[in-house]
From Swiss-Prot:
Source taxon at top rank: Bacteria
Lineage: Bacteria, Pseudomonadati, Pseudomonadota, Gammaproteobacteria, Pseudomonadales
Protein species of origin: Pseudomonas aeruginosa (strain ATCC 15692 / DSM 22644 / CIP 104116 / JCM 14847 / LMG 12228 / 1C / PRS 101 / PAO1)
Subunit structure and binding partners: Homodimer.
Protein name: Protein GrpE
SUPFAM superfamilies: Coiled-coil domain of nucleotide exchange factor GrpE (SSF58014), Head domain of nucleotide exchange factor GrpE (SSF51064)
Keywords from the UniProt entry: Chaperone, Cytoplasm, Stress response
Length: 186
């Protein structure tokens, strides 16, 4: 009987050890699954925040630039009014009331465009900027810095800081060196 008791005593500690190892392994496995689930949940929350942020940015851009096509179409009207004022004689008494009406209409257009963040680009005298200007011609000039805008054919416009239409300009270049004449060489 003592032998049996000793055998049972030897087996009893092994069984709990085996069961404890199984439980420890199971706890570790469950902890790993929990950590993976928490990580996945954090990633999903981050993805959801990113989607929400992108959607808010898209809505903001849509609000900012919804007027882009409409504003672009109005620029032709502004250009026509400006050309009409340039072509008409301010001293001609017969058209003076019409000129005043055109000036007031143009001022109203300019004020309205500014209210909706449409900003005119009139770069005369400024350095040429290919991101905002379109060079229509180059002209030699001794008085202007090479690479600067000499004349503006058509003003450009920005809508909320983004280019709506480039300014069409004439860009200065350095005068060509004239070869010395025969008289100067002699």
């Amino acid at each position: 009987m003592a032998d049996e008791q000793q055998t049972l005593d030897q087996q009893t500690p092994e069984q709990p050890t085996g069961a404890a190892e199984d439980l420890t392994a199971r706890v570790q496995e469950l902890e790993e699954q929990l950590a993976a689930a928490q990580d996945q949940a954090l990633r999903m929350v981050a993805d959801l925040q990113n989607v929400r942020r992108r959607a808010e940015q898209d809505v903001e851009k849509a609000h900012k630039f919804a007027l882009e096509k409409f504003a672009g179409d109005l620029l032709a009207v502004v250009d026509t009014l400006e050309r009409g004022l340039e072509m008409s004689d301010p001293n001609d008494e017969a058209i003076k009331p019409m000129r005043e009406g055109m000036e007031l209409t143009l001022k109203m257009f300019d004020d309205t465009l500014r209210r909706y963040q449409v900003e005119a680009l009139n770069p005369e005298g400024e350095p040429f900027n290919p991101e905002q200007h379109q060079a229509m011609a180059m002209q030699e000039s001794a008085s202007a810095e090479p690479g600067s805008v000499l004349k503006v054919f058509q003003k450009g416009y920005l809508l909320n800081g983004r280019l709506l239409r480039p300014a069409m300009v004439v860009v200065s270049k350095a005068p060509a060196e004239t070869p010395p004449s025969i008289d100067e060489q002699a």
